[in-house]
Amino acid sequence: MDDAKNSAVDVLEKQAAFLSSALPYMQKYENETVVVKYGGHAMGDPALGRAFARDIALLKQSGINPVVVHGGGPQIAEILMKMGIESRFENGLRVTDERIVEVVEMVLAGSINKEIVALINAEGEWAIGLCGKDGNMVFAEKAYRTVIDPDSHIERVLDLGFVGEPIEVDRTLLDLLACSEMIPVLAPVAPGRDGKTYNINADIFAGAIAGALEAKRLLFLTDVPGVLDKQGKLLKELTVSEAEKLIKNGTISGGMIPKVETCVKALQNGVEGVVILNGKTPHSVLLELFTEQGVGTLIVS
């Protein structure tokens, strides 16, 4: 019995120590904006989803203004399969035709968005689900991708349909929500000036939002610990120039390249620091913001 009691006391002491050590970081981020891109494995795990929602609620209770941007690629693919809609790919990238973009909007701005809102509201906060269409928050234009043909080595342009890139962000609505103690949860769907609807990569959307809000931090929750060196060791902090060198020498490769490039663009647009971290770690948002060492890779100018 005494051992059990002592063990319980030890746990409480550790919790109290963490809260005490977090105070200077809470003060550091008070009244600041933190944009969190929520995606990857964490979105499909109910326990991690609840932990994430509690983290966001705690940020708000600590005087921080969190803004959540979410993805939903696997969920979109699942619904398309159930509806019998075949996806067409160009060089590994899904072509979003008029029928598919309707499904994308339904899944992202509908079911996924409202699930996240409900999780945060269950923690006693006041979250609201939006997309780029609401309040003319974001306008997009059609995005094109260029690839090098492996056989001819000739560059060609890919038309991916209703895939867009943000070109304008109006922060007015987001500022009003922050003043109203509300937490925006944003789906990466936006209108174009041409009246069409565009699906936007969630990382790019989050970077544009963070830049417009001049966020203190932009956090990318991924399925990896952060940027790794060639030995697989986590790199705790990088400058933009260091990150660019790592891309050139092949240390940063594959899917991490566009993510780091998005980080760099966000920094150029006014974000103070961008962090790539593992969303599969419970409470990774708190561990990154409220501890000295953090748990991901911080990229700064």
Swiss-Prot record:
Keywords: Amino-acid biosynthesis, Arginine biosynthesis, ATP-binding, Cytoplasm, Kinase, Nucleotide-binding, Transferase. It is an enzyme of class 2 (transferase). It comes from the Bacteria. One of its GO terms (biological process) is L-arginine biosynthetic process. Substrate binds at G72, G73, R94, N199. It holds the Pfam family AA_kinase. Signal peptide: none annotated. Its main location: cytoplasm. GO terms for cellular component: cytoplasm. The record marks K37, K259 as: Transition state stabilizer. It is found in: Cytoplasm. Coiled coil: none annotated. It catalyses: N-acetyl-L-glutamate + ATP = N-acetyl-L-glutamyl 5-phosphate + ADP. One of its GO terms (molecular function) is acetylglutamate kinase activity. Catalyzes the ATP-dependent phosphorylation of N-acetyl-L-glutamate. Belongs to the acetylglutamate kinase family. ArgB subfamily. This is Acetylglutamate kinase.
